[in-house]
Amino acid sequence: MEVKTMLLLLYPRCTTCQKAKKWLDDNHVEYTERHIVEDNPTYEELREWYSQSGLPIKKFFNTSGLRYKELNLKDKIPTMTEDELLKLLATDGMLVKRPFVVNGDRILTGFKEKEWSDALL
């Protein structure tokens, strides 16, 4: 059975992503890094990760980001279908909550040290 390396999607200039990456390195957690904007998640990936995660779809959105605010998504999300939301996320990596971790069937959005410790160490 092939063991997949953990995937870390991040935006390199994001300070939270930098902290998360440092935390992973300090704790000797192996990962493959992927630029969330240059190689944004596809619709298929997002659908799979969403179904695996058990998280509400809003947790996948970067709600403090400029694009989220520009598109007035706070008001639009409640009126959109799950499929529409996943397609929207796939159009722009800046809409996706970061850092974003895929570790087998475990999905982590944002960097919360306690949550990451419990899930990854």
Residue ranges, per PLM feature:
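Local sequence-structure signature of Cys/Sec-based thiol-disulfide redox active-site neighborhoods
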Residues: 2-27, 31-36
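Thiol/selenol-based redox catalytic cores and closely related redox-interacting motifs
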Residues: 38-121
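A short alpha-helix capping/helix-coil boundary motif
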Residues: 1, 25-27, 64-65, 76
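Intrinsic disorder/low-complexity signal
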Residues: 1-2, 91
